[in-house]
């Protein structure tokens, strides 16, 4: 099952794609997270999923991938709570930086002010008057938490996962390097593209390997596989839940693979 939010002349609302059918959820069931949290335990059975959608007023928009991919997507969650990010979580990325892989997850935080949806303009620091031009990209698999987690086992963590989406941790490197903490290079307003689709865990397996690709003006600048992760999604969620309660709608970005970030710096004319 795939979840998303769209916006058109009728406003914004949630949609889902299940068994080649596109369903539109009524406005009363939006935002998406509220609907999912209410019924998540029943979505494991396909028959239950269809029944729940119909019983709650979901209507069929049509069928097929072509229709789904043509929808006017916006970011899938309006206001995520916590955004926890893992650094150095790909072996090839650590190697290209001449660093050892961490013994424990290297974590930092983002805030919702940084997020934008698909197709939105990244607010470049140079355009804000800071003069910074050392901006580049980090494509990442992002976990969307679907249920509360505290001191969770890896199995419990996966059971609480709503699904997977994509995030690009666009970073301002000169500001990031001003201290040993990465915070100020990672939290600029409107610099982190997120979404558009949340894919349920039964459809993909990051441990087996999902390809991550980042293109700048149609040129591939990063290509990696989630099979290269140091800490798996289950391990990250379980680890974080040992010291912090994760709530529905929280995001965990799982790190970025190696790539070419230095030959071209991102500017407002580029398409990421």
Language-model features and meaning:
Residues 1-105:
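N-terminal non-catalytic cap/leader segment that marks the start of a structured domain
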Residues 9-10, 50, 66, 70-72, ...:
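Catalytic-pocket segment enriched in acidic/His residues
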Residues 2, 82, 121, 140-142, ...:
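Residue-level marker of beta-strand positions
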Residues 7, 110-112, 126, 137-147, ...:
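Short, structured patches in soluble enzyme cores that scaffold and shape functional sites
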Residues 100-103, 107-111, 156-184, 188-189, ...:
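Flexible glycine-rich active-site/ligand-binding loops centered on an Asp-His dyad
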Residues 101-118, 135-137, 265:
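Structural signature of FAD isoalloxazine-binding scaffolds in flavoprotein oxidoreductases
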Residues 4, 73-75, 95-98, 122-135, ...:
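A generic local secondary-structure boundary/capping motif
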